[in-house]
Amino acid sequence: MAARPAATLAWSLLLLSSALLREGCRARFVAERDSEDDGEEPVVFPESPLQSPTVLVAVLARNAAHTLPHFLGCLERLDYPKSRMAIWAATDHNVDNTTEIFREWLKNVQRLYHYVEWRPMDEPESYPDEIGPKHWPTSRFAHVMKLRQAALRTAREKWSDYILFIDVDNFLTNPQTLNLLIAENKTIVAPMLESRGLYSNFWCGITPKGFYKRTPDYVQIREWKRTGCFPVPMVHSTFLIDLRKEASDKLTFYPPHQDYTWTFDDIIVFAFSSRQAGIQMYLCNREHYGYLPIPLKPHQTLQEDIENLIHVQIEAMIDRPPMEPSQYVSVVPKYPDKMGFDEIFMINLKRRKDRRDRMLRTLYEQEIEVKIVEAVDGKALNTSQLKALNIEMLPGYRDPYSSRPLTRGEIGCFLSHYSVWKEVIDRELEKTLVIEDDVRFEHQFKKKLMKLMDNIDQAQLDWELIYIGRKRMQVKEPEKAVPNVANLVEADYSYWTLGYVISLEGAQKLVGANPFGKMLPVDEFLPVMYNKHPVAEYKEYYESRDLKAFSAEPLLIYPTHYTGQPGYLSDTETSTIWDNETVATDWDRTHAWKSRKQSRIYSNAKNTEALPPPTSLDTVPSRDEL
């Protein structure tokens, strides 16, 4: 009988539950308030955005100690969630400390990325059949293809949405590159990368045997005369594969397709695989994405590869910020020097800080030590200052293109160079380099200039001024080559004072000419002083015109910008008339022929005699050469 009350209670609870279920939504607890009673709307949470697709970045590095810090810096700065990125890294056959640098970086960043796979191989240091570290024997092609295949296999096993293949000497300076490529929605797509020539990471034509084919489209795309995303038969070096696309399952790097009969070359093998899979490759040039060097020939050295990197860096700085190295690796310090000169002067207007900063960084990357000369600002010159200096324009002078008189900007430029000549005399500097702040440097500038000066010393040439950058104005006849000194000619009529080497005797002659009372633009004054100016009336005002002037051939520096180009700016052309500060000039936009590119030099007027004959090594073909 004791169990009956418990059974009765259980039965009562069951009846209550049944009643509540029958009432459905009408049943309420006393403490619950109806939303209709207090006027509050129910909260509806929006859907969150999709996460970014997952990307595996495959990096193969060999003898890349010099490129890795900047390459990894660019990789770090990609505006893409690192938690959605995996790093697949391999290195082998190194004679430098590539492995140590890569390992240091991976150790420091592995917590940032979703996944890191590291495949180092310390031995051997070279392939048995290679002639140098830049040579690609068959064994190297095979090894690289196997590594790429392993990376592709890992990406598939990890269910990555994309795989990005990128060479360690390709620098993605545009942080949006990965997002932009994904947005193209192509199975295989590459960003067009820039070099110091026409070379890039794509082909527009391919022969039936798989070799490079020249096409008109290539230059149109490479020079941005056509922009977009173009179907091409070949992309290489840096490209993105969408692994979500069904056809991507058919892609392979190794072994080559069973029907493959073309050259055993990694980029050609993969292009064939893409074709057999029915996948179109695409090349995009809608934006500026980054840079790559021109590949070296098989016989070239790692030192030349380092020089290639330096040139890529300094070219990138002309219109864009510097490529900074990774914050997660140690960087080897640089040790600037004066290249054997007593002094190197860089002339810069104080208000042109952007030019000064770019030039200082550019020179530092080349390990060149300079002294900044604060230029005389033509905009700050007034009439009383000109009178105090006894400055008068040479009678009858007119700009050869616009027929205008001298400008205060040109006077400021002259005074800036004059101050350098005075310092050369005061300090008794025997050999001095002078450069302006708006120049771009030729590839291997430092090595070439030092070699030229060594050759001049060995030949015991009597010189006083040597142009290293100029605009040659006499273009119908060749200039006279200097015997026993390669790459040097006797200078004819020239414009521009971008850069020159001057001796103590040369500075003394220029200052001793007392040019203030008969002033010309400095680049007209110099040809007068070496007696090559075509206007005889100007020369009459200067009795002594025996300056010994020469020029490097080919030139070693050029302007960063020319008339009409984005970024072009002139502080000499845009100014005021020399003796009337109320009359402004704006010649750089309408009449600045002086600042335009070098005009065409007649074929029979080229300074070919000054060039050394090519060696057999210079003619070794490169698989990527255009």
Swiss-Prot record:
Catalytic activity, reaction form: (5R)-5-hydroxy-L-lysyl-[collagen] + UDP-alpha-D-galactose = (5R)-5-O-(beta-D-galactosyl)-5-hydroxy-L-lysyl-[collagen] + UDP + H(+)
Record keyword Ubl conjugation present: no
Motif segment (Prevents secretion from ER): 623-626
Enzyme class: transferase
Localisation per UniProt entry: Endoplasmic reticulum lumen
Matching InterPro entries: Collagen_mod_GT25, Glyco_trans_25, Nucleotide-diphossugar_trans
Tissue localization of expression: Expressed in brain and skeletal muscle.
Pfam families named in the record: Glyco_tranf_2_4, Glyco_transf_25
Entry keywords, A to Z: Endoplasmic reticulum, Glycoprotein, Glycosyltransferase, Signal, Transferase
Annotated segments matching region Disordered: 604-626
Glycosylation sites (chain numbering): 97, 185, 382, 580
EC identifiers of the protein: 2.4.1.50
Signal sequence extent: 1-27
BP GO terms, sorted: collagen fibril organization
Family indicated by similarity: Belongs to the glycosyltransferase 25 family.
Function: Beta-galactosyltransferase that transfers beta-galactose to hydroxylysine residues of collagen.
Protein name: Procollagen galactosyltransferase 2
Originating species: Homo sapiens
Organism lineage string: Eukaryota, Metazoa, Chordata, Craniata, Vertebrata
